[in-house]
Amino acid sequence: MPRIAIVGGSGVYDFPAENKREETVKTPYGEVKITVGVVGDEEVAFLARHGKGHSIPPHKINYRANIWALYELGVERIIATSAVGSMNPEMKPGDFVILDQIIDFTVSRPRTFYDGEESPHERKFVAHVDFTEPYCPEIRKALITAARNLGLPYHPRGTYVCTEGPRFETAAEIRAYRILGGDVVGMTQCPEAILARELEMCYATVAIVTNYAAGMSGKKLTHSEVVELMQKKSEDIVKLILAAIPLIPKERRCGCKDALKGATG
């Protein structure tokens, strides 16, 4: 039973592991295909967020099915990757950012498992989970330590602005997000991080800066540019995650595991 899962974003459609097998997990929100393999002494699950070959746009991803499927497999910890545009001049293309905060500007995505009586499962209640610190401190610490030990260009914190997509942002939007305190911008952290918290799973993300955001460089933004840089950084992404996995404590002492306490009723 995998304790740890990797959710691969743009440019991360597979992960090296031994004895791989494909699992099809049925959830109340649909079926999900997950790869399970062995990394070191850990059984690890891998899920390609956008599907193989980037076939699903960010606003159409079945986030609820994905997170529920990992939960059903017994996953407690999730390491996600996310390609991002930088709004912070200090965060350059090729840098890694271990995210610590989110500003959510998505508008059309289902963002909770707890829809009361309308929930398609036995948890027919309403929950208001605490999201003060959206990312697991224990996984973040492991990622930061691994990045430092490997000598990778990294930033130990960063605020992610999540937009609806699939279009890139306007220059005016980026100026507004910078005023609000955003460092990087992307399209997938919400509701993914929220849903993981609702199921009391630990979740953290390593963001990879692929370009400067709209209006920052004067260049046209292209998805091919994102994929190209992610391919160049793929080896470092794998090294970072492989180095972080053994640093994640077996026993969870973070607040993620108790997210539903006080959230209902």
UniProtKB/Swiss-Prot annotation:
Q: What is this protein called?
A: 6-oxopurine nucleoside phosphorylase
Task: Output one GO MF annotation.
Answer: guanosine phosphorylase activity
By its UniProt entry, which SUPFAM superfamilies does this protein fall under? Purine and uridine phosphorylases
Q: Pathway it acts in?
A: Purine metabolism; purine nucleoside salvage
Say which domain of life the source belongs to. Answer: Archaea
Q: Which UniProt keywords apply?
A: Disulfide bond, Glycosyltransferase, Purine salvage, Transferase
**Disulfide bond in keyword set:** yes
> Would I find Disulfide bond among this entry's keywords?
yes
* Role summary: Purine nucleoside phosphorylase which is highly specific for 6-oxopurine nucleosides. Cleaves guanosine or inosine to respective bases and sugar-1-phosphate molecules. Involved in purine salvage.
Oligomeric state and interaction partners are given as: Homohexamer. Dimer of a homotrimer.
Source organism (scientific name): Pyrococcus furiosus (strain ATCC 43587 / DSM 3638 / JCM 8422 / Vc1)
Pfam families under this entry?
A: PNP_UDP_1
Q: What is its EC number?
A: 2.4.2.1
For this chain, the annotated S-S bridges are: C136-C202, C162-C190, C254-C256
Quote the cellular component terms of the Gene Ontology held in the record: cytosol
Q: What miscellaneous comment appears in this entry?
A: Although this enzyme belongs to the family of MTA phosphorylases based on sequence homology, it has been shown that conserved amino acid substitutions in the substrate binding pocket convert the substrate specificity of this enzyme from 6-aminopurines to 6-oxopurines. It seems that P.furiosus has developed a specific enzyme (PF0853) for the metabolism of 6-oxo-purines, next to the canonical MTA phosphorylase PF0016.
State the family named in the UniProt similarity comment for this chain: Belongs to the PNP/MTAP phosphorylase family. MTAP subfamily.
Q: GO biological process annotations for this chain's record?
A: L-methionine salvage from methylthioadenosine; purine ribonucleoside salvage
Chain residues that bind substrate: M187, N211, Y212, A213
Q: What result follows from mutating C256S? A: Fully active, but reduces thermodynamic and kinetic stability of the enzyme
**Thermal dependence of catalysis:** Optimum temperature is 120 degrees Celsius. Thermostable up to 133 degrees Celsius.
